[in-house]
C-alpha cells in the first residue's frame, strides 16, 4: 500500500476530504492507520491528553521525538506529521531547522507542523529550504494561549479575520503544503480555503475546509468525562468501556473465576510425579 506523502496531500486540494487525527504512541498509530487516516499528527497536545499537563507548553523537542518515534514504529500508511513544540522555532531559522530535522531523523516524521502566521515565515522558509515539508497552523494556536488570554475563537472581528487571511497567503508563499485552521468562524475558514491553493484542515472551523482533524482521544471518548470543546463529536465512549472491563476483571480475580484452566499453563502428570518425588529432599517443601 502506498505511503501518503506531503505532495500527495497538497494535490488533494478541492478533492476528497482529508482525514486527519492524532496519535502519540504505537497502538494509537495502528488504530488510526487501520481506520484509514490520511495524516497522523503527533501533536504537542500529548502534553494535555497523555501527560496530564494543563497546556501544550510543557513539552520540548525530546518529548516530541520520543512520541513521534513510537508512532513511526507502527509503520503507518498515513503521513506522519511531527508537531514542533513551543520555543523550538522561535529563536532563529538555524535552530528551527535543527529541531525540525530531529523530528524527521530521530522521530521518523515525514513533515512538521508549526503555529503562527507572517511572523513565522522566516522559520518556515528555512525548514522548507532544508527540504522538510511544513504544515501551517492558524487561528486558535494553543502555544499562544498566554498571549490570547485563553482558548478563544479567533477571527470573529473583521480586521482579525482579514489578518488571518493575509497570514494564510503568507504561509503558502513560504511553502507550506497545508494549513490547519483551528477555532475559526466557518465563513472565515471558507474564505481562506477558497483563497489558498493548499488544503485547509479544520478543527472547529466548520465544514468548508478541505479536511478535518480531531484528537484521537476525543473521537474515541477516552477523556473520562472531561470537558470537551464545542467542535468535538465523540464517536465512542471507550473510557467507560475500559472501566467496565477492568471492574469485571477485578471481580473475577476476587471470586477466583480468573484465571480459568484454559488460561493456565499445565505441567505434564509424569513431570509432576517426578517433582513430588524430589520433595523428599530436605531442601524442598513437601506438597
Where are these regions (language model features)?
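Alpha/beta enzyme core
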Residues: 2-236, 240-274, 278-287
